[in-house]
From Swiss-Prot:
A Pfam family recorded for this sequence: QueC
Cofactor binding summary note: Binds 1 zinc ion per subunit.
Domain of life where this protein originates: Bacteria
GO MF term set: ATP binding; ligase activity, forming carbon-nitrogen bonds; zinc ion binding
Catalysed conversion reaction: 7-carboxy-7-deazaguanine + NH4(+) + ATP = 7-cyano-7-deazaguanine + ADP + phosphate + H2O + H(+)
Top class in the EC scheme: ligase
HAMAP family reported in the protein's UniProt record: QueC
Keywords, alphabetical: ATP-binding, Ligase, Metal-binding, Nucleotide-binding, Queuosine biosynthesis, Zinc
Protein name as catalogued: 7-cyano-7-deazaguanine synthase
Protein task: Catalyzes the ATP-dependent conversion of 7-carboxy-7-deazaguanine (CDG) to 7-cyano-7-deazaguanine (preQ(0)).
Upper lineage: Bacteria, Pseudomonadati, Pseudomonadota, Betaproteobacteria, Rhodocyclales
Gene: queC
């Protein structure tokens, strides 16, 4: 019997690669995507495309309203998405507690499924300063997961897999390409339009374009202009 894993899938480049890795490691993948009030909801359409291309045992989309709080350029249209290039520090595109909420919901589903493994595509090398994309955060969440769940208390260790955490964007792209990921299906842009066309100037677009250039592969991203 295949081991079950819950895979967080945004529809972007990193999470698509993460799904491909989970499947290559023999996991039966249960994908979890989120509509949290993000302005770039085209990524949810992309997540569906990725699941259909790579395969998954199940794909669910959950709703939670972080737009009610705002506080991020991704959930509050009154805050502009930075376009001047990646800057030091934590950017306004950081969404407070987003990854913690997503991982907690993944943890709940994993327990119900009897899964001991959760995959998340966070990255600490080419990231834009997000505190919840660091190795320390992933390690701390895994510790919490094993303290706070029936499975963990009963001795069934839960593992949070972050296979991209130490990879550059170019290395992520090469890894995914080797596993058959079609990156034209993915959407990374923070302000993609309804057709999934990218702006080309936000931090996420810049990191993606630089990654493809460094990987020596053609960038299949669809840009608005």
């Amino acid at each position: 019997m295949m081991k079950k894993a819950v895979v967080l899938l945004s529809g972007g480049l990193d999470s698509a690669t993460c799904l491909a890795i989970a499947r290559s490691q023999g996991f039966e993948s249960y994908c979890l995507s989120f509509n949290y009030g993000q302005r770039h909801c085209a990524e949810l359409v992309a997540a569906d495309r990725v699941v259909k291309a790579l395969g998954a045992a199940e794909h669910r989309v959950l709703n939670f309203g972080l737009a009610q709080f705002g506080g991020s350029a991704l959930t509050d249209t009154n805050i502009a998405v930075p376009t001047e290039g990646v800057q030091p520090g934590i950017p306004v595109t950081y969404v407070p507690a987003r990854n913690t909420i997503m991982l907690s919901l993944a943890l709940a589903w994993a327990e119900v499924l009897g899964s001991r493994d959760i995959f998340v595509g966070v990255n600490a090398v080419d990231y834009s300063g997000y505190p919840d994309c660091r190795p320390e955060y992933i390690a701390a969440f895994e510790t919490m997961a094993n303290l706070a769940t029936k499975a963990g208390v009963e001795g069934h260790k839960l593992s949070i897999h972050a296979p991209l955490i130490d990879l550059s964007k170019a290395e992520i792209i090469r890894t995914g390409a080797a596993l058959g990921v079609d990156y034209s299906l993915t959407v990374s842009c923070y302000q993609a339009d309804e057709q999934g066309r990218a702006c080309g100037v936000c931090d996420s677009c810049r990191l993606r374009a630089e990654g493809f250039a460094a990987a020596g592969l053609a960038d299949p991203t669809l840009y608005r202009a």
